[in-house]
Amino acid sequence: MRILAIEASGPVAGCALWEDGTLTAEYSVQYKKKHSQSLVPMLSEMSGMVDLELSSIDFIAVTKGPGSFTGLRIGAATVKGLGLALDKPVLPVPTVDSLACNLYGTDRLICPLMDARRQQVYTGIYENRDGLKVLRPQCV
C-alpha cells in the first residue's frame, strides 16, 4: 500500500511517501511560511527522486489540524485537487496524531505538544504497543 502524506499545518511544509510499512521518501522545507509556493514543487521533486508515478498511490493523507489556518487550507486544497485529479481517497489526520507518529516504535507514553497561543497547548497522550493507541485525544 502506498500513502502520500502532506503536512502544511505548521512552520514546516512537507510531503512523504509511505510504502508497505516503510518510509520511502520525505521532503520538508521551513522557509518563511510560503507553503503555497513550495508544496507542489516539493511533491514533484520527491516523486522524481523515487520514480513515483502519482497514479500508483492508494491514498493521500493530509493533516487536518490543529494548526495554522492558512496552512491547513493550503494543505487541504492541494490534497483535494490531487485526490480529484488522480481519483484517490483523501485521509484527514489530526496534526497531534501525526506528531505522535514521529516516535513510532518506542514503548513509552508519547505526549506531543503544539503551541495553541494564549498560554495554551494542543496535546494528546498516546501509547505505542501493537500500533499507536490514543489514550487521551487531542485537547487544549
Label each region the model flagged.
Residues 43, 78-82, 99-100:
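Buried hydrophobic packing segments
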Residues 1-64:
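N-terminal beta-alpha supersecondary unit
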Residues 48-55, 84-93:
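Phosphate-handling active-site elements
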Residues 11, 65-66, 116-119:
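Short glycine-rich anion-binding loops that position phosphate/pyrophosphate groups of nucleotides
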Residues 22, 34, 89-140:
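Surface "functional belts" at beta-alpha junctions
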Residues 59-90:
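DPxDG-like acidic metal-binding loop motif
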Residues 16-18, 74, 124-125:
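Short amphipathic alpha-helical segments
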Residues 30-38, 69, 73, 77, ...:
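Residues at secondary-structure transition points
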